[in-house]
Regions:
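An anion/pyrophosphate-binding glycine-rich loop and adjacent beta-alpha core
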Residues: 269, 273, 282-381
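A glycine-rich dinucleotide-binding beta-alpha-beta segment and adjacent secondary-structure elements
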Residues: 207, 215, 381-465
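Extreme N-terminal leader/targeting segments of oxidoreductases
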Residues: 1-24, 42, 461, 465
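Glycine-rich FAD pyrophosphate-binding loop
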Residues: 42-63
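Conserved redox-cofactor binding core of oxidoreductases
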Residues: 107-225, 247-248, 393-412
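Glycine-rich active-site loop/strand segments that organize a redox cofactor
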Residues: 69-108
Length: 490
């Protein structure tokens, strides 16, 4: 059990025997860890990865596989979309804040095309096809999709819409079992193995090891119940994931997720953050969280979402993660989908990757007035909402929230409502403050010697908002930087 207390380092002077040694030691074999291992090995370092579980993959291998890339990648161009680093940055600064790290986002956008090419060179496959329907991810093996609300209000007025959700090609994928994330991780691990990267499994990192100057020189881990000391001759890379499954840290830093299921894996217990904190590591955006909204987007887009007062509050055609944040943060987790019979049947028949998120209506009625009464909403509240919506929908517009005209249609009869109260879960976005070279920063602003980090144990490009693919995107991008930086150390 890990609590929220910083985990003190061990002095190298007390280590009588190093059980393992390498130039660069990487804690965690998910997307950030494997990317760090590849680049460190390519830089000539002897690399050892310590993985807590019995196999590689981490949360990345179970994910849908979105990697947020843009700026004019070959895949974007092949699918007929124009994009630029400047346009990508404009969207990310608007969508991932407030307080987004402009230096990191600029760096990420300018390096995005090269990062796509790096992934392809490592064997990650992308099919040159675009999926344009609403959804959490493509239901087939299409390689490109909108994954952050780029084509929805307000962002489609801030930056030119461009899809940036790049998905590794995989037939018969099953998110949570063997999804697109598996086809991201598999070729990267194979690349690492070809480069001579070693891996030790069932290694639960316990604490960092420092020398008398304060430099990080290793890790103590527990393997099969026994403490083992691992020496890092050049540097240690922390890549063990978020703190979504550390209840004490959630209570201390991200209380909006208290009681919400974690959209992560239970190994995400924040230990790397606590180990680095004991060395004086600075933290950033620890309250930031992504929130998933658990209703199939093919249904949501065809109705109207209302809160506990019967009022609309978000354009229904936007990114589901944005809907989740707006629902949990601003509507007390109260949400109902009001939809007529014809639209419900159309949405239920539409192709989707998430048919298991198609909830059944809880209430149905011939009129909105009856539905409102059955739902227990204030008299007239839902009626006025639907009246205003239908008035403009008859003209194909939504001047209130600016849902795109293709999804705007008057709500007819019979009409139903889905009870979506509490249909959210989330994961944390905050963590260690790092430089663009993935150096872990001390609260003084100086890098901690010998210590690097990437992935969800750090605060990456997301400071509050989110787009699907940014975790795997900046995890791999800054994982590479961590490996390069660690390998350069003397």
């Amino acid at each position: 059990m890990v609590d929220a207390t910083p985990i003190r380092p061990r002095s190298a002077a007390t280590v009588t025997k190093w059980d393992y040694e390498a130039d660069v030691v990487v804690a965690g074999y998910g997307i950030a860890g494997v990317s760090a291992a590849i680049e460190a090995a390519r830089a000539g370092a002897d690399v050892l990865v310590l993985e807590r579980t019995s196999g590689w993959g981490g949360a990345a291998a179970l994910a849908g596989g979105f990697i947020y890339l843009g700026g004019g990648t070959p895949l974007q161009k092949a699918c007929g979309f124009d994009d630029s680093p400047e346009n990508m940055k404009t969207f990310m600064m608007a969508a991932l804040g407030p307080g987004a790290d402009e230096e990191k986002i600029t760096d990420y956008c300018e390096g995005s095309v090269a990062h796509y090419n790096w992934l392809v060179d490592c064997g990650v496959p992308f099919k040159e096809s675009f999926w344009g329907e609403p959804g959490w991810e493509p239901p087939f093996d299409d390689g490109l999709m909108y994954s952050g609300g780029e084509n929805a209000a307000p962002f489609n007025e801030i930056a030119t819409p461009a899809p940036r959700g790049h998905v590794p090609q995989m037939d018969g994928k099953r998110t949570g079992e063997k999804g697109g994330g598996y086809m991201l991780m598999k070729p990267l691990v194979e690349t690492a193995e070809k480069l001579g990267v070693r891996a030790e499994y069932d290694m639960r990192v316990q604490t960092l090891v420092t020398d008398d100057t304060g430099r990080v020189v290793g890790i103590v881990a527990k393997q099969y119940g026994k403490d083992v000391a691992v020496r890092a001759r050049r540097g240690v890379v922390l890549a063990t994931g978020s703190f979504a499954y550390n209840d004490k840290m959630i209570e201390a830093h991200a209380p909006r997720l208290i009681g919400r299921p974690g959209a992560a894996i239970e190994e995400h217990d924040g230990r790397s953050i606590l180990m680095a904190q004991a060395l004086g590591a600075d933290l950033a955006h620890m309250d930031a969280t992504e929130v998933a909204f658990l209703c199939d987007p093919q249904l949501v887009v065809r109705g109207i979402l209302v809160n506990g007062r019967g009022q609309r509050y978000v354009p229904e055609d936007t990114y589901s993660g944005r809907i989740g944040q707006m629902t949990l943060f601003h509507q007390d987790n109260q949400a109902f989908l009001v939809i007529d019979e014809a639209s419900y049947e159309e949405g239920a028949a539409a192709t989707t990757a998430t048919p298991f998120l198609r909830a059944q209506p809880k209430w149905a009625a011939e009129t909105v007035e009856e539905l409102e009464s059955d739902m227990g909403l204030p008299a007239g509240a839902l009626q006025s909402t639907v009246e205003v919506y239908n008035k403009h929908a008859a003209e194909g517009s939504d001047p209130l929230l600016h849902k795109k005209s293709e999804w705007v249609k008057p709500i007819g009869s019979p009409v139903a409502a889905l009870d979506l109260r509490g249909f959210t879960l989330g994961f944390t976005l905050g963590g260690l403050r790092t430089t663009v070279n993935s150096e872990v920063l001390h609260v003084s602003g100086e890098p901690i010697p010998g210590l690097f980090a990437a992935g969800r144990c750090t605060s990456g490009v997301c400071a509050g908002g989110y787009a699907s693919g940014t975790s795997l995107g900046d995890g791999s991008f800054y994982g590479r930087r961590a490996g390069i930086s660690a390998a350069k150390q003397n």
